[in-house]
Amino acid sequence: MKLSKLCKVGMSFLTKPYYRTRVLIKSGYYDNLSDEDFLKKIFPKYMGYPLDLENPKTFSEKLQWLKVNYRNPIQTVMVDKHKAKQFIAERVGNQYIIPTLAVWDSVEDIDIDVLPNQFVLKSTHDSGGIVICKDKSSFDFEAAKAKLSASLKRDYSKIAREWPYQNVPRRIIAEEYISELGSDDLLDYKMFSFHGEPKLTVVCSDRFSKTGTRMNFYDINWEPMGIHFGHYPPLPNEFPKPATYEEMKRLTAELSKDCPFLRVDFYEIKGRLFIGELTFFPGAGLETFRPMSKDYELGEWLHLETVHRS
């Protein structure tokens, strides 16, 4: 590492609590803390206010409460990138899932010869362990194995104590390659459901641009909510309601009917919906809302008094 970059990293560690906390988490510094103590330690560093687990009010606080107090085994199935497909197919139909081509227990088991010329490889237990092959003849298989091997070694549940990932079998799946999923113009629709009732949709755009992902929030009537979420500013222009919006609502309600909270991610490609993933803790519940009043507004939709501790 160049001296200038090393100095920059060191300065960030010393002056930015958010950055310092991420480095310490990655190093395993907090691994011996209980989930409750860990979350109370890091929450203020990310959010700017202390975590109250006894009387949580904001949406972000209530997500931390759910991490500590609500543990339904089906959640592990729903975040498993392989098993979630079966769950989705049984609930709403297999026409909404991206076909799986193969599953392996380790990178050494991957048989590239059985795959088509284009495919996607993913680790089943975390976020970010993805490799895309657009052409086998130029595909760097060794680099792909190195990336996936590093992903398989990572305990994703430790990063923000998202416990559902802890017991997901660490495997590699190969999926059908859908070219539109890599398009700069593709929109990602993330629908938030509270106690089985869809309440808002986040439209993610510019996912592959130099400026980074933008997020625009809409209420159930597709009215802009004016939310700036974490490091993802909204675009000034608004997006039209998708033609498949009512179908998204129906699918989200069905998939989330047994959940205090669930986010369902959709892609709309040539009029057809695909479900990307199911998420219980958007941004790990550690992304700021601006204005902060929106964090309280969403918190009012999550009724913890109806949730049975487990």
Model-identified regions with their sequence ranges:
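Membrane-proximal basic amphipathic "stem/tether" segments
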Residues: 1-70
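A conserved helix-loop-beta module that forms one wall/lid of the active-site cleft
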Residues: 55-134, 143, 149-163
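Short, flexible loop/turn elements at secondary-structure junctions
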Residues: 104, 125, 176-178, 193-195, ...
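Phosphate-binding site of ATP-dependent enzymes
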Residues: 115, 141-230
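A short, polar/proline- and glycine-enriched secondary-structure boundary/capping micro-motif
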Residues: 132-133, 210-217, 285-289
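Short acidic-glycine loop/turn motifs at beta-strand connectors
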Residues: 135-136, 193-197, 269-271
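A long amphipathic alpha-helix within ATP-dependent nucleotide-binding catalytic cores
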Residues: 167-171, 215-275
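C-terminal active-site "lid" helix and adjoining low-complexity regulatory extension at the edge
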Residues: 250, 268-310
